[in-house]
Amino acid sequence: MTLIYESAPELDETITIDPDIEDLHYDRTVDRHKVHRAAVSEVFLTDIRRQSAQHVLVAAQLPSSHSFFHDSIYNDAEGTPDALLLLEIARQATIASAHEVGVDAGNTLISNEFGLTIYPHEIAALNPEDTNLLIRNYFDWTSIRRGAPRSGRCYQQLIMGNRVIAEHFSGGRILTKNQLQALRSEYRGTPPPTTANLHELTFTDVQDPIAPERVGRRNPLNVVISQLNTTETPTAQVTPNVANKALFDHAYDHITMQILTEAARQLYLATRPDSELAPEISSIRGNFLAFAELDSPVQIRAIAAGEFVVEQDNRQIADFALKS
């Protein structure tokens, strides 16, 4: 199978950073609504500064501890930012920056694809005390209607200690609330349930749970797959615990891209022959073809080394590629 992912071009190096970035602050978080979060503790951005029409600088700070991102059995992970944490910071920066350049605050960004490349050698050169990040965000809109962006990509550089430690891009569409509701109902035929309606979900009673250490975790709450099968083609069911507020910060009507990405990482870890060693993930790519519904089983399946597809109701809804 050929993954849908296309290589992202590098950020335009002719873009200059305003000297005033020294004024970006790191002493308080931005309004949680700017990153679509309910809990302030889940907000990692601290400042936003628009540089030009489509270029935004964002300040962020790595959390000193976190129930999900810092839950790892690998000692080496303590000195390296978790890949999913960098993805979440990039996601928050994309949302906040999009609103900064003209996307209405009431609209929803629907992700179709993302790519994260991490540079471990740059991270290794950092001062262990470094926690402040600078994220350069540049938008390339592919559709604009009535002066408002409707679809496109955001390209990002994540910088710590004057070093680019990672690059990220994401692409997708922007929908109003009414457009999103119509899309969801048209696809399903009925309005989708939400995580607030626990009795309607299919993964509240997990069968054949996996030991946390099998997927690099300590806390069972952070295990998002179950019914692991490694005999031939490795497969697992995607069964996140809705009590995990780090994953379900508010009520959702689908399984999020963050959870599906973590499911891919956990299946990757569970099927590695040297799973006792801490993997240094250098890149993650993801594509999303449809929403992962809450009321029908979701399966993740390995199709090659480091490559996975997510399926629901006998159709592919996402794919991932991970590299160490």
Predicted features, each with a name:
Residues 1-78, 175-247, 324:
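Non-catalytic linker/capping segments at the edges of enzyme domains
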Residues 68-76, 99, 103, 123:
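Flexible, membrane-facing loop/turn or short amphipathic-helix motifs
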